[in-house]
């Protein structure tokens, strides 16, 4: 089945399948976590065993057996139900050779993009901000997104034209308020430290920290770049950053370094809820440049929550104004990728 023959009825069926698959995969994550709880209860007076993991590209880029088991479960279910569909999973991709890794999702056939456990570091520390992320793409565009955060009891779902939902009953966003007139002032700003920790004055870590301080500093500070945001949040999960922006709990998410599986499901949910997503890196003419659509594989993302209109400003105008004010305060990040 090619994307040209994916009918509305078929998309509904795929959506139903994806939602159930997300629930089942979330249950597997929770079962693995509970096993650690039960082992600790049974051996309360003894030293607890630690969660074993393997480093990939760095000490903060890790994989557990749970990551691999859950991805294998998801991939098997998809291959059984939709054998003609393509599949890209984080762990499958990581194990492929550099020469065979695809740069971008440009498949003309329907494609599933999966992160079996986003927030692996959180999971190893039993911090509840971890989830499974499942996206379905048509012509390279996310049209279905499912994010299950089992320890939080939260399920985020969306299908193009059918709305975005929390736990299948609450429409997203929870509220649709205008963007603050002083944005980024009055906003909750979400960002991540990332996995690039190289100690270089012009490295991504330093650029991020400078941007964080600009966003947080008092108005008039930092050479006029002080944003005085209400707060800065870092969840350790790009997928959940997107979900909470779609929910309206975060006003802004700014990030570089993510991959397709980190963001595909969240983008589907965010856009269906009415959020706006573009490139994290500011153009030279940030005040007047056209705000481009994000490229899924670009690794550079700036997101503004769903918004409502205000007197004299449409919702879209408020979102675009906020994007420009963020661009004015952040550094360009160095995450290059062929084809992006």
Swiss-Prot record:
GO terms of molecular function: inositol monophosphate 1-phosphatase activity; metal ion binding
One example of a Gene Ontology biological process annotation: quinate metabolic process
Binding site for Mg(2+) 2: 115, 118, 262
Binding site for Mg(2+) 1: 90, 115, 117
Reported phenotype of the disruption mutant: Does not affect carbon mediated repression of qa-2 and qa-y.
UniProt entry tagged with the keyword Metal-binding: yes
Induction, per UniProt: Expression is induced in the presence of quinic acid. The quinic acid (qa) gene cluster is subject to two levels of gene control: a primary system which responds to the presence of quinic acid via the qa-1S repressor protein that blocks the qa-1F activator, and a secondary system which represses transcription of qa genes in the presence of a preferred carbon source such as glucose.
Superkingdom of source: Eukaryota
Amino acids binding substrate: 90, 117-120, 262
CDD domains per the UniProt record, alphabetical: IMPase (cd01639)
Keywords tagged on the record: Magnesium, Metal-binding, Quinate metabolism
Coiled coil: none
Keyword match Glycosyltransferase: no
PANTHER family: INOSITOL MONOPHOSPHATASE, PROTEIN QUTG
Family per record: Belongs to the inositol monophosphatase superfamily.
Stated role: Part of the qa gene cluster that mediates the catabolism of quinic acid (QA) and as such, allows the use of QA as a sole carbon source. Its function within the pathway has not been determined yet but it probably plays a regulatory role. The qa cluster encodes 3 inducible enymes (qa-2, qa-3 and qa-4) catalyzing the first three reactions in the catabolism of quinic acid to protocatechuic acid (also known as 3,4-Dihydroxybenzoic acid).
Protein name: Quinic acid degradation cluster protein x
Record organism: Neurospora crassa (strain ATCC 24698 / 74-OR23-1A / CBS 708.71 / DSM 1257 / FGSC 987)
Gene of this entry: qa-x
């Amino acid at each position: 089945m090619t994307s040209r023959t994916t009918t509305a009825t078929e998309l509904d069926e795929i959506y139903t399948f994806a939602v159930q698959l997300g629930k089942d995969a979330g249950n597997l994550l929770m079962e693995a976590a509970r096993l650690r709880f039960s082992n600790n209860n049974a051996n309360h007076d003894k030293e607890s065993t630690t969660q074993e993991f393997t480093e990939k590209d760095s000490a903060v880029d890790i994989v557990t057996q749970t990551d691999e088991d859950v991805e294998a479960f998801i991939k098997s279910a998809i291959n059984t139900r939709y054998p003609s569909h393509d599949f890209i999973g984080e762990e499958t991709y990581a194990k492929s050779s550099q020469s065979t890794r695809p740069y971008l999702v440009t498949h003309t056939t329907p494609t599933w993009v999966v992160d079996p456990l986003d927030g692996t570091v959180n999971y190893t520390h039993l911090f509840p901000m971890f989830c499974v992320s499942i996206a379905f793409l048509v012509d390279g565009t996310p049209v279905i997104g499912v994010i299950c955060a089992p320890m939080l009891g939260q399920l985020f779902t969306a299908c193009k034209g059918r709305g975005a939902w929390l736990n299948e009953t609450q429409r997203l966003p929870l509220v649709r308020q205008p963007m603050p007139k002083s944005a980024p002032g009055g906003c909750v700003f979400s960002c991540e430290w990332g996995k690039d920790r190289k100690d270089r004055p012009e490295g991504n870590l330093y650029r991020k920290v400078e941007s964080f301080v600009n966003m947080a500093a008092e108005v008039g500070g930092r050479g006029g770049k002080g944003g005085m945001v209400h707060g800065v949040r870092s969840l350790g999960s790009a997928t959940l950053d997107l979900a909470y922006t779609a929910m309206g709990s975060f006003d802004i998410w700014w990030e570089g370094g993510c991959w397709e599986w980190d963001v595909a499901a969240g983008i589907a949910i965010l856009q269906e809820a009415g959020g706006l997503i573009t490139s994290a890196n500011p153009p030279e003419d940030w005040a007047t440049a056209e705000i481009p659509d994000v490229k899924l594989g670009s690794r550079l993302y700036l997101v503004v929550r769903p918004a409502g209109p205000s007197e004299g400003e449409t919702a879209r105008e408020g979102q675009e104004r906020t994007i420009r004010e963020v661009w004015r305060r952040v550094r360009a990040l160095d995450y290059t990728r062929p084809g992006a």
